[in-house]
Amino acid sequence: MIFAANFKMNHTRASTKAYLDALNQKLASKRSEDRVFVFPPSTALDHYDGDFTIGAQNAYLEKNGAFTGEIGLDQLDEFAIKTILIGHSERRDILGEDQAFVAEKFSYFKSQGFEIIYCIGEALEVREAGEEAVMVHLLSQFEGIDLSYEKMIVAYEPIWAIGTGHSATTEAIASTHAALKQHFDRPLLYGGSVKPANIKEITAIESVDGVLVGSASLEVESFTQMIFA
């Protein structure tokens, strides 16, 4: 099972270090087959010791250059970061990354050998239009994406469930994941208001290979409760 914590724009460099020190101690008894990822803000990227993988929430598709406010391959290489989130709905919807740019970013980091957690998801109005509309929308988010890339993990996050406290039903998760898995053979995570109270029922779904957790991962106790549930 895969457990990924996306801190988004939360935690400082100091609090991230304290979090990861505590996490490392708690992971001493984790199941060997489980994988743990943590995506801190870019200001907290560093070398950390532990049975977890540190990834970047975002980076620009260049080694370096005149891209104000961005980080590139040089900054990631400094800390041996080889894992990245791409396609998160907040980057698409708030920061204006269209599918063409997302696909370009995917291709660049694929060419650099990165492990990529690639995010897809639908808005509430799409979900309300029915399962067929949902699948048409989700599959459109794979345009330009190499589904055979061996270092890709897919994360399905219904936008209407992110940060709202309202997760999709287990039936909806199972149905959507099963439909998606007809199109690729990569690990598939669920994200969207995942928390200790619902982690067992979500990870019990056959087509769920793990979870991408936002707000419920910000406290190390909460995140480790999910890992050891």
From Swiss-Prot:
<dbReference type="GO" id="GO:0019563">
    <property type="term" value="P:glycerol catabolic process"/>
</dbReference>
<dbReference type="GO" id="GO:0004807">
    <property type="term" value="F:triose-phosphate isomerase activity"/>
</dbReference>
<feature type="binding site">
    <location>
        <begin position="6"/>
        <end position="8"/>
    </location>
    <ligand>
        <name>substrate</name>
    </ligand>
</feature>
<feature type="active site" description="Electrophile">
    <location>
        <position position="88"/>
    </location>
</feature>
<dbReference type="InterPro" id="IPR013785">
    <property type="entry name" value="Aldolase_TIM"/>
</dbReference>
<dbReference type="InterPro" id="IPR022896">
    <property type="entry name" value="TrioseP_Isoase_bac/euk"/>
</dbReference>
<comment type="subunit">
    <text>Homodimer.</text>
</comment>
<comment type="pathway">
    <text>Carbohydrate biosynthesis; gluconeogenesis.</text>
</comment>
<dbReference type="GO" id="GO:0046166">
    <property type="term" value="P:glyceraldehyde-3-phosphate biosynthetic process"/>
</dbReference>
<comment type="pathway">
    <text>Carbohydrate degradation; glycolysis; D-glyceraldehyde 3-phosphate from glycerone phosphate: step 1/1.</text>
</comment>
<feature type="active site" description="Proton acceptor">
    <location>
        <position position="157"/>
    </location>
</feature>
<dbReference type="InterPro" id="IPR020861">
    <property type="entry name" value="Triosephosphate_isomerase_AS"/>
</dbReference>
<keyword id="KW-0413">Isomerase</keyword>
<dbReference type="GO" id="GO:0006094">
    <property type="term" value="P:gluconeogenesis"/>
</dbReference>
<dbReference type="InterPro" id="IPR035990">
    <property type="entry name" value="TIM_sf"/>
</dbReference>
<comment type="similarity">
    <text>Belongs to the triosephosphate isomerase family.</text>
</comment>
<keyword id="KW-0963">Cytoplasm</keyword>
<dbReference type="Pfam" id="PF00121">
    <property type="entry name" value="TIM"/>
</dbReference>
<dbReference type="GO" id="GO:0005829">
    <property type="term" value="C:cytosol"/>
</dbReference>
<dbReference type="InterPro" id="IPR000652">
    <property type="entry name" value="Triosephosphate_isomerase"/>
</dbReference>
<comment type="function">
    <text>Involved in the gluconeogenesis. Catalyzes stereospecifically the conversion of dihydroxyacetone phosphate (DHAP) to D-glyceraldehyde-3-phosphate (G3P).</text>
</comment>
<protein>
    <recommendedName>
        <fullName>Triosephosphate isomerase</fullName>
        <ecNumber>5.3.1.1</ecNumber>
    </recommendedName>
</protein>
<feature type="binding site">
    <location>
        <position position="193"/>
    </location>
    <ligand>
        <name>substrate</name>
    </ligand>
</feature>
<feature type="binding site">
    <location>
        <position position="163"/>
    </location>
    <ligand>
        <name>substrate</name>
    </ligand>
</feature>
<keyword id="KW-0324">Glycolysis</keyword>
<dbReference type="GO" id="GO:0006096">
    <property type="term" value="P:glycolytic process"/>
</dbReference>
<keyword id="KW-0312">Gluconeogenesis</keyword>
